[in-house]
Amino acid sequence: MAKEVYDRSKPHVNIGTIGHVDHGKTTLSAAISKVLSDKGYSKATDFASIDAAPEERERGITINTAHIEYETEKRHYAHIDAPGHADYVKNMITGAAQMDGAILVVAATDGPMPQTREHILLSRQVGVKYLIVFLNKADLVDDEELMELVEMEVRDLLSEYDFPGDDIPVIAGSALGALNGEPQWVAKVEELMDIVDEYIPTPERDTDKPLLLPVEDVFSITGRGTVASGRIERGTVKVGDEVEIVGIKEETKKAVVTGIEMFRKTLTEGLAGDNVGALLRGIQRDEIERGQVIAKPGSITPHKLFEGEVYVLSKEEGGRHTPFFDNYRPQFYFHTTDVTGSVKLPEGTEMVMPGDNVHIDVELIHPVAIEQGTTFSIREGGRTVGSGIVAEIKA
């Protein structure tokens, strides 16, 4: 028998489970997988194999993450479950797991706990726009009023972080009950996935987004002009397209793409993920450099001031051995280049220890093409000491 071919007919969505430790994230992940596999949509992944999440390295940071996949009638899902709280934080901040939406698991027996709050805040910062609440362990709560109280608390907490707390779907159930095949709880997991299908919109595909091509290398071809090469991060580029060259320099330049090459072959169009060389008309060799981006006109602008959510590597991960303080000046590696910047710590934070995550204000010495959701590394002399994501552009 041949292996199954990956079926692209269903739209693909990335989701994950978030919430406080021991509230049942991994049990719910296993239950969803089992319930959908019993319907014949996908193979089940059991609790033990999700819990024994393999170690991955993303930009020098060690993260344990379990990836499972499953299908509903309407969609194909990739589902991320990060076992430990630190893994979850690293996952969100490094962009290792980019989620289109997430299921917030809250134990009805406990209500919202500190990590519930932190995960909601992080979801807001890194741009996970759609959350659905699963009130777990409902089989252990007999008191209807208590359930309503927990639901109200969760909704208030969501509203506090600018999520639509009143409108977010909330389902009460038992992940363990569903995993054990108890019909009333299986039905709740089925209902949860119907809501996930409906509530989380199908994301725009990378190729449908505006062009972004970070420049890695620049060279001139005598008689033809300047070529900039790099990997297309998103969007598409066609011969004849007008583009902008953004970042590093104060002035944004316009150019026209007159040729595209990949592996020494000529293309009419480059797509997200392709490593291409783009021949640019109207640009001198010294007007473009590594670290700039080639973008669809008007789609991205250069900035120096931003707020970032940052994870600082621990000593064991090869990070700093000592804390850093206000006005720390490392390099920020965006796209393809390092730019020096100075760090302002939040009020009341004296210092940041290796292994911490922190919200910082950064001022760069050059403007860089960035937007909310752009990821970066923090480096000292070429060594990565932290990883972050742009939460908000200031100027």
Swiss-Prot record:
GO terms for cellular component: cytosol. It is found in: Cytoplasm. Mg(2+) binds at T26. This is Elongation factor Tu. Its EC number is 3.6.5.3. It catalyses: GTP + H2O = GDP + phosphate + H(+). Disulfide bonds: none annotated. One of its GO terms (molecular function) is GTP binding. Keywords: Cytoplasm, Elongation factor, GTP-binding, Hydrolase, Magnesium, Metal-binding, Nucleotide-binding, Protein biosynthesis. Residues 174-176 are annotated as: G5. GTP hydrolase that promotes the GTP-dependent binding of aminoacyl-tRNA to the A-site of ribosomes during protein biosynthesis. GTP binds at residues 19-26, 81-85, 136-139. Residues 19-26 are annotated as: G1. It comes from Lactococcus lactis subsp. lactis (strain IL1403) (Streptococcus lactis). Residues 136-139 are annotated as: G4. It is an enzyme of class 3 (hydrolase). InterPro entries: EF-Tu_GTP-bd (IPR041709), EF-Tu_GTPase (IPR050055), EFTu-like_2 (IPR004161), EFTU_2 (IPR033720), G_TR_CS (IPR031157), P-loop_NTPase (IPR027417), Small_GTP-bd (IPR005225), T_Tr_GTP-bd_dom (IPR000795). It holds the Pfam family GTP_EFTU_D3. Residues 60-64 are annotated as: G2. Belongs to the TRAFAC class translation factor GTPase superfamily. Classic translation factor GTPase family. EF-Tu/EF-1A subfamily. Residues 10-204 form the tr-type G domain.
